[in-house]
Amino acid sequence: MIAQPPISPDESHSMRHRRRIATVSVIPTLLTLGNLICGFAAIHYASKPIGPSNVMGWSTLTIAGALVFLGMLFDGLDGFAARLTRSASEFGAQLDSMADMVTFGVAPAFMVLRLVSYYYGGPEHYTGILGPDADNAYGKIMWGVAAFYICCTALRLARFNVEIASTDEADHRFFRGLPSPGAAGAIASLTLLHQHLMVIQFHEIPPDGFEKTSSLLL
């Protein structure tokens, strides 16, 4: 049996340092996965019938929009955690883009289809009136617009990954064009308008409500 040479103090310190970095680098990965889960949950809630829920009286579509904004928070925190722990890597960049594709690509497009189908076809309709097999041009066009948005998001994220060949996190602080979270935030903001319209629909406003509110503000 060949005896192993003793490990020097410097090598022992280096091994402990690598183990610590490997442990700490899990934090950015978990934050990125949190973004991915938010996107999946947003699609889940958007697929439900639109109406008031048990969550603060919000509609299911409003919850989906809030989850997109929560995904934006996770998307910002994972980059901050990677810079803080100096654990930026190609793996993290690719995983981040995959999570962004779901939360900021597929989820907002599906939310728009649900919102349009609700106001165009009535509360009893889902997305059946929209799609390539719809019996009207409007339904086909709206489905095509949503599909075009998803394609643009995929191309935007792929271009970002290809252009950023370096693993230096400082290079990821600059964008060309509109970042996908910004576009998704603009679409998710429509759910806030939808929530406001639902409040007006289910709670009758008195005739003099506007005058009273204006007087109070003055």
What are these regions (language model features)?
Residues M1-G76:
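Topogenic membrane-insertion module of multi-pass membrane proteins
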Residues M1-R16, D168-L218:
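C-terminal membrane-associated helical module and adjoining short loops/tails
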Residues I2, S14-L36, A82-M101, I141, ...:
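Interhelical loop and helix-boundary elements at the membrane-water interface
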Residues H17, I21-P28, G57-A64, S89-G92, ...:
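Membrane-interface helix-boundary signature
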Residues L30, A66, L84-L157:
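Multi-pass membrane catalytic core of lipid/isoprenoid biosynthesis enzymes
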Residues F40-S47, G105-V116, A186-L193:
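Membrane-interfacial alpha-helical segments at the cytosolic side of multi-pass membrane proteins
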Residues P49-L61, V116-W143, I164-E169, Q195-T213:
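Short helix-coil transition/hinge motifs at the ends and kinks of transmembrane helices
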Residues V68-D75, F148-R156, T191, L218:
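Alpha-helical transmembrane segments of multi-pass membrane proteins
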